[in-house]
C-alpha cells in the first residue's frame, strides 16, 4: 500500500519506519529542510513512561491561579484572540476531576509502556545510537508538602507495576552524585529506574536514515497546502502545484494538525509552548548523570554526552514562538541551583517549541471517519516517549492487523462529540 505521511518529527518518522518495515511504500513530506526541526528539535530529552500523566489533574486549576503571580511559575496563559483557545481550556478543566484523570492516565501509561518496549526492540534490532542513557529519572522535592504528595503518584506506580525508589536527601547522591552538595535544599526524591534519556533530534535523524534504508522517501522543503477530497475520501495532498497521491494518508503535523484538517473534522490539539537551553558541560563531576525533574519549577535537567539540556514551562499562548528572556532566566536559575558549575549557561543555546496537546493528555492515534485518513498527533510533552508505540500501532491499523494494545480509545472518535466547535465529523 502507498502511504503518505505529513510531518517528519519524531512521531512522523517513527510512523514511516514501522510502516516501511510492514512492507508499505512510504513517502514523508515536510516543509522543513530535514527531520525533527520543529517540536522534536530540542525537547527535554526524556523517555519517561513512568511519568506519563495528564496535565489536566485534580488541583491544577487552583495551582494555575497561584502560578499566575509567581516569577518562575511553570505555567503562563495569554489570550491568543481565538475562540478555540477558550474552548480548549474549558475542555481541559473538565478533565481535572479524579475520575477523568484516572481514565486518561491509564490510556497514557498503556501507550507509553508499550512504546518503551518498542523502542527497546528497535535498539536491539538496529543498534541505533542517540546519546542515550538508561539511568532512570529522578523527581526532586523541595518541600515536605511535595514529598507527602508523592504518595498519590506512588500508588499509581504500584498499580501499574512501575518500579520506583523513594529516596531521602542523603540517598539522592547515590542516583545523582552531584546533588550531594545541595541535598540540604531538598526533602527527597522519587526515582524511576526504568526511564531513559537521550537526544530526540539525533534519534529522529538516525531513525529517518534507517527508514530510508527500508525504502522510505523523504520530501523536504515541500509545502503542504491541503488535502484533496473526492467521494468522501482523501484523493491526494496538494503540495504547491503538485498533487501527491497514495492509498492512505497520515497527518502527523503536531500542533498544526488541527487547522490542517479543520475542513474535515475539528480536533482539540492546541500548541503548548515550551522552552529549553542546551549548555556545554564544563565539569562532569558537577553535572547530572541522567535526568532530574524539579517538582517546584516543573523543569527537566538532562545529561547528554557533553551537554546539559534544561527544558520545561508551559505557555498557553497560541502559535507565538517568541523567545522570552525571563524564561531563559528561570531555566538557568534552576540548573545552576541544583548543579552549580556543571555547565556553562552563558554559552547555552536557547530554543522554544510548540507541543501538540489534547485536553485529556492522551494523543490522537488511529483511524478517522474518513476511511483512508489516519492521525498520529497530540502527544503533548510525551512525543518521544510515545513515538515508537504510536508508530507501531498505526502501522498495525493500516496493515489491517490487530494492535498489541487496546487502541480504540486513542482514536479521534472519543472527541467527535465534544471537540470545540463540532458535534459530528464532516464525513460520518
Curated annotation (Swiss-Prot):
Cofactor(s) this protein cannot do without: FAD
InterPro entries hit by this protein: DadA (IPR023080), FAD-dep_OxRdtase (IPR006076), FAD/NAD-bd_sf (IPR036188)
Recorded GO CC terms: cytoplasm; plasma membrane
Domain of life of the native organism: Bacteria
An example Gene Ontology biological process: D-alanine catabolic process
EC number: 1.4.99.-
Name this polypeptide is given: D-amino acid dehydrogenase
Gene name of the encoded protein: dadA
Amino acid at each position: 500500500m502507498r502511504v503518505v505521511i505529513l510531518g517528519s518529527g519524531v512521531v512522523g518518522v517513527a510512523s514511516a519506519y514501522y510502516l516501511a518495515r510492514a512492507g508499505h511504500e512510504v513517502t514523508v513530506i515536510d516543509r522543513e529542510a530535514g527531520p525533527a526541526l520543529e517540536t522534536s528539535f530540542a525537547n527535554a530529552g526524556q523517555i519517561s513512561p513512568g511519568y506519563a500523566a495528564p496535565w489536566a489533574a485534580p488541583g491544577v486549576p487552583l495551582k494555575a491561579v497561584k502560578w499566575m503571580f509567581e516569577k518562575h511559575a511553570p505555567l503562563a496563559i495569554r489570550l491568543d484572540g481565538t475562540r478555540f483557545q477558550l474552548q480548549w481550556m474549558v475542555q481541559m478543566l473538565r478533565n481535572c476531576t479524579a475520575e477523568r484523570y484516572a481514565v486518561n492516565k491509564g490510556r497514557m501509561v498503556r501507550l507509553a509502556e508499550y512504546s518503551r518496549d518498542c523502542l527497546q526492540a528497535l535498539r536491539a534490532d538496529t543498534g541505533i545510537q542517540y546519546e542515550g542513557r538508561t539511568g532512570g529519572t529522578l523527581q526532586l522535592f523541595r518541600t515536605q508538602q511535595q514529598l507527602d504528595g508523592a504518595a498519590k503518584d506512588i500508588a499509581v506506580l504500584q498499580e501499574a507495576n512501575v518500579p520506583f525508589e523513594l529516596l531521602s536527601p542523603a540517598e539522592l547522591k547515590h542516583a545523582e552524585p552531584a546533588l550531594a552538595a545541595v541535598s540540604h535544599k531538598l526533602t527527597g526524591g522519587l526515582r524511576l529506574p526504568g526511564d531513559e534519556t537521550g537526544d530526540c533530534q539525533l534519534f529522529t535523524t538516525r531513525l529517518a536514515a534507517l527508514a530510508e534504508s527500508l525504502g522510505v522517501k523523504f520530501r523536504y522543503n515541500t509545502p503542504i497546502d491541503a488535502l484533496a477530497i473526492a467521494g468522501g475520501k482523501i484523493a491526494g495532498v496538494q503540495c504547491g502545484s503538485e498533487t501527491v497521491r497514495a492509498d492512505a494518508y497520515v497527518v502527523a503535523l503536531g500542533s498544526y494538525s488541527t487547522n490542517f484538517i479543520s475542513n474535515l473534522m475539528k480536533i482539540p490539539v492546541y500548541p503548548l509552548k515550551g522552552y529549553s537551553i542546551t549548555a556545554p558541560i564544563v565539569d562532569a563531576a558537577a553535572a547530572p548523570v541522567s535526568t532530574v525533574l524539579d517538582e517546584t519549577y516543573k523543569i527537566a535537567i538532562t545529561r547528554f554526552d557533553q551537554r546539559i539540556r534544561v527544558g520545561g514551562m508551559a505557555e498557553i499562548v497560541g502559535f507565538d514562538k517568541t523567545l522570552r528572556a525571563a524564561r531563559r532566566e528561570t531555566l538557568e536559575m534552576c540548573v545552576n541551583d541544583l548543579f552549580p558549575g556543571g555547565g556553562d549557561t552563558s554559552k547555552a543555546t536557547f530554543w522554544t517549541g510548540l507541543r501538540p496537546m489534547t485536553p485529556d493528555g492522551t494523543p490522537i492515534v488511529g483511524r478517522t471517519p474518513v476511511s483512508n485518513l489516519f492521525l498520529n498527533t497530540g502527544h503533548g510533552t510525551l512525543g518521544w516517549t510515545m513515538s515508537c508505540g504510536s508508530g507501531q500501532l498505526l502501522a498495525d491499523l493500516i496493515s489491517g492487523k490487530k494492535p498489541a494494545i487496546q487502541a480504540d480509545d486513542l482514536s479521534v472518535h472519543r472527541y467527535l462529540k465534544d471537540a470545540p466547535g463540532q458535534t459530528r465529523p464532516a464525513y460520518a
